[in-house]
Amino acid sequence: MSVSRRVIHHGLYFAVLGPLIGVLFLVLYIFFAKEPLILLVIIQVLPLFLLMSITTGAIPAMLTGVMVACLPEKIGSQKRYRCLVGGIGGVVITEIYCAVIVHIKDMASSALFENILSGENLVVRIIPALLAGVVMSRIITHLPGLDISCPETDSLS
């Protein structure tokens, strides 16, 4: 598979599935770590919750997918290292993206955006980004569109 096709494949899958996986882990975290009654409130506003996760998480997830696609063969072919890089990259890219958004006042003008992007809710951003990066890095080679018969042996140079 060519590098450009792998970048598009990984970027799109990460952007579409990454925020949804992050929401799943965040809901589980809230259910087990906080009060289970808060989960009832989240279920009532789940469409808005999903929309907010996609608007704040799709671009960092896509950039994480591009980063995972551009890994050298020695790192990208080993699941353990690919998951490690995907998780760390997801957290770092998400935090950089949120810092940029906070400094752009027009995009962060609503109280809901400011609440999500504030430093007080760091766990709400880190846990979904870390786990979505790890899970997506693990399953990306099994998703449709990747030519399994042709191993990824092309170099990036």
From Swiss-Prot:
The chain crosses the membrane at residues 12-32, 37-57, 84-104, 126-146. It is found in: Cell inner membrane. Residues 33-36, 105-125 are periplasmic. Keywords: Cell inner membrane, Cell membrane, Membrane, Transmembrane, Transmembrane helix. One of its GO terms (cellular component) is plasma membrane. Belongs to the CbrB family. NCBIfam families: PRK09823.1. This is Inner membrane protein CbrB. It comes from Escherichia coli O1:K1 / APEC. The gene is cbrB.
